[in-house]
Amino acid sequence: MGTGTLSSLLLLLLLVTIGDADMKGHFDPAKCRYALGMQDRTIPDSDISVSSSWSDSTAARHSRLESSDGDGAWCPAGPVFPKEEEYLQVDLRRLHLVALVGTQGRHAGGLGKEFSRSYRLRYSRDGRRWMDWKDRWGQEVISGNEDPGGVVLKDLGPPMVARLVRFYPRADRVMSVCLRVELYGCLWRDGLLSYTAPVGQTMQLSEMVYLNDSTYDGYTAGGLQYGGLGQLADGVVGLDDFRQSQELRVWPGYDYVGWSNHSFPSGYVEMEFEFDRLRSFQTMQVHCNNMHTLGARLPGGVECRFKRGPAMAWEGEPVHHALGGSLGDPRARAISVPLGGHVGRFLQCRFLFAGPWLLFSEISFISDVVNDSSDTFPPAPWWPPGPPPTNFSSLELEPRGQQPVAKAEGSPTAILIGCLVAIILLLLLIIALMLWRLHWRRLLSKAERRVLEEELTVHLSVPGDTILINNRPGPREPPPYQEPRPRGTPTHSAPCVPNGSALLLSNPAYRLLLATYARPPRGPGPPTPAWAKPTNTQACSGDYMEPEKPGAPLLPPPPQNSVPHYAEADIVTLQGVTGGNTYAVPALPPGAVGDGPPRVDFPRSRLRFKEKLGEGQFGEVHLCEVEDPQDLVTSDFPISVQKGHPLLVAVKILRPDATKNARNDFLKEVKIMSRLKDLNIIRLLGVCVQDDPLCMITDYMENGDLNQFLSAHQLENKVTQGLPGDRESDQGPTISYPMLLHVGAQIASGMRYLATLNFVHRDLATRNCLVGENFTIKIADFGMSRNLYAGDYYRVQGRAVLPIRWMAWECILMGKFTTASDVWAFGVTLWEVLMLCRSQPFGQLTDEQVIENAGEFFRDQGRQVYLSRPPACPQTLYELMLRCWSREPEQRPPFSQLHRFLADDALNTV
């Protein structure tokens, strides 16, 4: 070895030693190379799974390095060429830094000849999102074995932070491959799950210096990297000269991520860090470059804020630490920022510029886990067992091998006694079931007899709630109905008695609810007693619903401390044009309906028909154009149509043969619509009520409904990997992730406005949102009337039409509609937006299973199913959606908080 080489090695060793001293408490990837338990069986058989195996003797449990169990290795059932879909998966149970992998073929005492010459790795931190491992030059393929017996170790540069690791053997032709593996690394004690930062920039000197985070494994959108880890958490500390690197054959600036002061008018770079659990933070250490002769300076100061949950506000005053940006010593160094023991799961830190450039190579934290029982979040999605999945992102766990059990020989007497005891227990169980069934039959028969009375109010006490249902007389026969074809789902033969309907109908309150819906009003009934407040909790069967002002309470009020922050809306029957009740709204003053609608009369001659959007029981919805609208429409909002261009409007038309009650409801709907004044809610433009047919004219947006609009788009920067329907060859308009958040924020803003009026929109979904110019969103209400979305609604035994996939469990089982249930629907709508409306919510479940899942929420035994996280959705935003689906309505965030998060914090939170 030459003198120059020896000097270089000594210098490198000195630099690493200095870096370790500076970055106190930070891990050293060179020392993180312990075997993680495949060979010594610390990893149990149950944590090793495979896509398939040739036989039981080549199953997953035989894939341990240097093991000769079974036939000597794991061998997949099918060929790995050309699809490369066979994999071996290892679950480490906790996050680990994996720095090295070892592979081996099948030797089997000289009888085996199978091995893999190359392979790929995929890894996941949560079991939902899978990432391809790539080296520092973007290559995925790792060279493997050259013979069946030898062990080949491969350094992973960069290392990966993972809980689950999959090996995908490769071949260049159809051939058999077998594999044994081991993983090397150490436990990831930092607890850092991801960081968000602006994309690194390029510095132009005599040569281009690329200061990007080249190993970041999250998403990139709108100049922001989020949802992953990269070079700032890989343990590699940069050199004093940022143009040089400790890695071989890389570009100048590789070790650092940097930003120019000119690109940040605010004077600081903002980063956010997400951790695995609640922690008490003592110190943040940032390794910075200080080569001020080339423009790199230490930060002038740092300020950090903390919060405990994704949708919570930042707590208290920020922690400030002044640094000043040293000009003296040009060496790179680690700066320590004391954090004072503040507690949180999320940190937001701002690094102030003291010079032209900020260059960081590593950021680490010294913290302790805090055991706080109050910091709870909804559980991760759980899916019931089904057929073996075939996509890469599915988990397949092989059951632990069974050990032989010695059989004890018993006497015939003992066997006979055991059989008798079993028979007696079975008989007792059957008797108990029969008694329980008889009890419910009596309850239901009483409920049915009550429905037949001419005027009756029923009180049903449920733990913590009181449901008040009023039934008015009406015809016995339900309205005609033609079974819709579900959208995007195969046709199934319906069972004679659906399980989901049985679950609904087992609730006496819901039987009364459906009985009410089955009888449309046929005229004024007998006078209602003064003490009977007319209410109706029917689900989604008209356009608008309006609660009356409460009179004297029928029951004593609950204690003040038991009142949730969401109030239930008392509801009266209001059958609208499109046949579906949408809003539950506060009562109008007495006689307000009789005063007639606001006189914004619209000349029918100016309406030009374009197409029929939908129809309901009492009317239709048409899409029309209005010529020269500026001289016709007066409102509180400007009309964004150029002079000489027509205005698109939706016209709700009441059929001339509609009943008197339907006409009164139509006028009441006009009155309600006239009260809605918000930029994100469709507005009433005018009415035609001088002669038949009665019409109301509302906004309609040029880009149609949000569901159709988003499904025609693709997400920028190829973030949509894993979305249904995406293909490399698809050509179409794109939409950015920040724009999706902007869409969600507008929906939250409109719903916030409705909540301030105590309005409850009971059918919130992308089909009921309209898209205008510059992605303007307005919430509408006639999605139910469109045949295109018939598959989104479920008919309960031919009576109530319910959007059950968007409904909170208490709406499905108890008919309770509140602002909190709208928050639930908003979470589903946000899921639709982030999926670009490519999938129906719970698309893998039948309608009956969705209803049964609502029952699981009621039982609260941990078996309820949640919507899975969309591929492009950061974990923190998904946790916010899970909070929207909390079992207890009072635990769901209000719309003001949802709007603030989506409008201000979402892009900076992952």
Curated annotation (Swiss-Prot):
What tissue specificity is annotated for this entry?
A: Various embryonic and adult tissues; also proliferative zones of the developing brain; hippocampal neurons.
What the record says about family reads: Belongs to the protein kinase superfamily. Tyr protein kinase family. Insulin receptor subfamily.
Name of the protein in its database record: Epithelial discoidin domain-containing receptor 1
Q: Where is this region: DS-like domain?
A: 193-368
Tell me which Gene Ontology terms the entry assigns under biological process.
Answer: animal organ regeneration; axon development; branching involved in mammary gland duct morphogenesis; cell population proliferation; cell surface receptor protein tyrosine kinase signaling pathway; collagen-activated tyrosine kinase receptor signaling pathway; ear development; embryo implantation
- Which residues are on the Extracellular side of the membrane? 22-414
- Binding positions for Ca(2+) 1? 212, 231, 254, 256
SUPFAM superfamilies per UniProt:
Galactose-binding domain-like, Protein kinase-like (PK-like)
Q: Name one GO cellular component term.
A: plasma membrane
- Renumbered to this chain, region (Disordered) spans 467-494
F5/8 type C domain location is 32-186
Subunit architecture: Homodimer. Interacts (via PPxY motif) with WWC1 (via WW domains) in a collagen-regulated manner. Forms a tripartite complex with WWC1 and PRKCZ, but predominantly in the absence of collagen. Interacts (tyrosine phosphorylated) with SHC1. Interacts with SRC. Interacts with MYH9. Interacts with CDH1. Interacts with PTPN11. Interacts with NCK2.
Which Enzyme Commission number(s) are listed? 2.7.10.1
Give the subcellular location. Cell membrane
Q: How does it sit in the membrane?
A: Single-pass type I membrane protein
Q: Where does ATP bind?
A: 613-621, 652
Query: Which ranges belong to the motif PPxY motif?
Result: 478-481
Active site at which residues? 763
Query: Which catalysed reactions does the entry list for this protein?
Result: L-tyrosyl-[protein] + ATP = O-phospho-L-tyrosyl-[protein] + ADP + H(+)
Keyword Metal-binding attached: yes
Q: Which GO terms describe its molecular function?
A: ATP binding; collagen binding; metal ion binding; protein tyrosine kinase collagen receptor activity
Recorded name of the encoding gene:
Ddr1
- Organism the protein comes from: Rattus norvegicus
In this protein, which residues make up the domain named Protein kinase? 607-902
Which amino acids does the record list as binding Ca(2+) 2?
Answer: 231, 234, 236, 361-362
